[in-house]
Amino acid sequence: MDQFIKQDETGDLIETGMNVANHFLSAPIQGTNSLSKASIIPGVAPVLIGNPEQKNIQHPTASHQGSKSKGRGSGVRSIIVPPSEAGNGGTQIPEPLFAQTGQGGIVTTVYQDPTIQPTGSYRSVELTKIGKERMINRFVEKPRISTPVTEFKRGAGSGCSRPDNPRGGHRREWSLSWVQGEVRVFEWCNPICSPITAAARFHSCKCGNCPAKCDQCERDYGPP
């Protein structure tokens, strides 16, 4: 059996293929109802069905809104607020670098060790890892070997921040931002009756027992 195709046969095959392509390209598809299962060649169903459904999703009508528009993804999805974050209220704190809101809080910087200079394509990953390690170690309080003395230590526990305090209190929160090789930290206080959210937020007291300021945040507002 001859396995070679003659030149005139090649021209006929190309012409036939072009005619088939032009036939389908010139025939407009009005909707999914114009495509029956028996008329679709196996293997091309997702392409043929996806095209009209894409048009129906982008230009929905009253009869198509609902279950049909939810069946197949159109590639454009709206942002959905997680249920755990919805309704928590409070004022969202912007990027720690610009967190000068006037509501209290302090911005500090944890500088990168100049002797450690990672290079290569993973430089930013290594710097971020080092910054996180320094932040974790910064807020770990070492065991005391002597009698505690009266001192102000940001982030330490206080009488008004104990969860079992019936008078309410504050808890210290931190928001971290990696900016040009430095870790920027914004820290502030929230009432202990307020929810703990993933996004940095200022909350107001809901129980009526939390003080306006505590010994942790009294210096966040500057000198009296």
Swiss-Prot record:
It is found in: Virion; Host cytoplasm. GO terms for cellular component: host cell cytoplasm. Residues 54-65 have a biased composition (Polar residues). Signal peptide: none annotated. GO terms for biological process: symbiont-mediated suppression of host cytoplasmic pattern recognition receptor signaling pathway via inhibition of MDA-5 activity; symbiont-mediated suppression of host JAK-STAT cascade via inhibition of STAT1 activity; symbiont-mediated suppression of host JAK-STAT cascade via inhibition of STAT2 activity; symbiont-mediated suppression of host type I interferon-mediated signaling pathway. Its main location: virion. InterPro entries: Paramyx_V_Zn-bd. Zn(2+) 2 binds at residues 193, 205, 207, 210. Disulfide bonds: none annotated. The keyword Cell cycle does not apply. Keywords: Host cytoplasm, Host-virus interaction, Inhibition of host innate immune response by virus, Inhibition of host interferon signaling pathway by virus, Inhibition of host MDA5 by virus, Inhibition of host RLR pathway by virus, Inhibition of host STAT1 by virus, Inhibition of host STAT2 by virus, Interferon antiviral system evasion, Metal-binding, Viral immunoevasion, Virion, Zinc. GO terms for molecular function: metal ion binding. It holds the Pfam family zf-Paramyx-P. The keyword Zinc applies. Residues 54-94, 150-172 are annotated as: Disordered. Zn(2+) 1 binds at residues 170, 189, 214, 217. Plays an essential role in the inhibition of host immune response. Prevents the establishment of cellular antiviral state by blocking interferon-alpha/beta (IFN-alpha/beta) production and signaling pathway. Interacts with host IFIH1/MDA5 and DHX58/LGP2 to inhibit the transduction pathway involved in the activation of IFN-beta promoter, thus protecting the virus against cell antiviral state. Blocks the type I and II interferon signaling pathways by interacting with host STAT1, STAT2 and STAT3, and mediating their ubiquitination and subsequent proteasomal degradation. Interacts with host IFIH1/MDA5 and DHX58/LGP2. Forms with host DDB1, CUL4A, STAT1, STAT2 and STAT3 the mumps virus V-dependent complex (VDC). Belongs to the paramyxoviruses V protein family. This is Non-structural protein V. It comes from Mumps virus (strain Enders) (MuV). The lineage of its organism: Viruses, Riboviria, Orthornavirae, Negarnaviricota, Haploviricotina. The gene is P/V/I.
